[in-house]
């Protein structure tokens, strides 16, 4: 994991007028001798800093790692993280170009003010595979006699060492002496192959063909599909029915076909994609121009269209709908600046992050995105276990329209496409605040080549309101601010962009926020307004959000895999249900409030709908706080959101999707820890006929009492479209929480008692 910052001129100002390529000798003096001047923009960009010029303030803003610098041309001082710093040589403007001393970087950025990044002395055993390790793994598998030349790679990731050994490293510093090992998932035409590779000894430990699996959709499949569509004379003829004579203006979206037990007429063992298309009209938003009721079924092995499915011809909506501001005058806003005058409150040592009392490891996986590991909380000098691993487990976006172009749409974004592979680089000041540190991440592409994603993850601290407050009459106010540390990651899957925040509170709470933004998948219809004759039928499965455009009703359902280890691995699922009970103690009251507490002892019983009026805890019954209560963490799958809550799958129980992906319908699942059980939708969900995920994991109904348990929470929203979300959707959130419950002895943010 490495930090990487990018050049981004401020929108309200003119871009830097400093496009020069050679150094300039200037009559500027430093410490009595002539200074050597170099171009500001080129020098700072090569250093990896973010450079902005504010034309109104006549000021440069320079951002690198934890340093936030403001400097005006000619000034003898710069403001670094809110503090004044003397400059031996000022910034000089000459002929509209900015120049700095060749010692400027050392003077400003290496002035000892920032200690965010620390050198990792002992590599964490869960560190992501390096670029060299990825290349080594590919070299080893390519040398295997079973390897075929046309094989592609869908995942190359760390094969995790033993969990107990990793915890021993995190808690006691005990070295993990097992060799670094890689899991390699390959696709040979339609055949999926798994290999485990010993990188240290350069040998293959296992080579396993996976029968009946279809594997992920890879990025080169998108290119193949576009070429197939563009060169198909059959498809070109069908396009003419829709008034389209140039197939080159058609943009394709390859989609998985789902499973309908043969009722869709598709051969189960073929590697197929369904393709819906849009017209590129030049407005920058082809999503606004769907070619409705037209679906091409593409065979990826044969590289041809095997079937075209059609419904009634609907004219392509042609009204321009750009969302990039080309036709708008956006109101200017005054700058909002966040400075950290004394540096950051967190440090990043290799891939391990320390903030306040929290320590955790962070890596990026090509399927599920960030994985947070060995999460601990320092409680008055004692490092306490909270969670071994937490990550997105999987997600699904199912649509409720039965028409020809929609009935199969149920996007398993991580399981079918790989959301880590589709990571969207974070833009400072827009996708994350200006004080964020951006981390680059390296994963493998489909050829096996290591690829670095710049700005893949953002880390930042933020003010989050009062942590606590009380004003007693006649006494001074007592209050303190709440701080949060946010780990942000964004993945763009087709039309939608998903923002995931892991939010650490200094009081021991962990928030998990999932936000959906981007562009709705819309349907072309005849109706322009709700007064048109076809409007009622056109909006049966959605909302008319523009002339001739319906936003279809669907769900965004997220599942998070949370291997909580509350003060150790032996945990128990406990229920607490507040109830009204008769008052038997006398007095005028007829009723009381009491809590019915009981243990949920098996996997089948643990799979539940979430009732926000109840409490579910993962408890360590062998550990107590000072009052004798077992230490616990509360599990809150849905802690609010900005769309209606997805309280279950909006499908009839006889639907195949309901049976294949049962994780959708219940918000709480708890299973025994097994290292191979990682995905709620199963490892290979593409065209799967049965539930190979959580439904299968819980089928044997293992005991959960005093065992190493894994919590899975399903959360999300049911998305009923509205006009305010078109042509681009404001971010809509779903929130989940993990809260300490008698884990501490008192309010944890009071601090340590004075000696």
Predicted regions and their residues:
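Primary recognition of N-terminal secretory signal peptides and signal-anchoring hydrophobic helices
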Residues: 2-11, 15-122
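Surface-exposed coil/turn segments at beta-strand junctions on protein surfaces, enriched
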Residues: 33, 93-95, 177, 268, ...
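Interaction-mediating elements
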Residues: 40, 50, 120-122, 136, ...
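Short, non-transmembrane alpha-helical segments in secretory-pathway proteins
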Residues: 125-170, 218-262
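Extended effector regions of multi-domain proteins
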Residues: 199-204, 208-217, 240-242, 280-370, ...
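Exposed beta-strand-loop-beta-strand "reactive/processing" segments of non-cytosolic proteins
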Residues: 148-200, 246-300, 356, 487
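Extended intrinsically disordered, low-complexity coil regions enriched in Ser, Thr, Gly, Ala
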Residues: 50-56, 69-79, 112-120, 148-149, ...
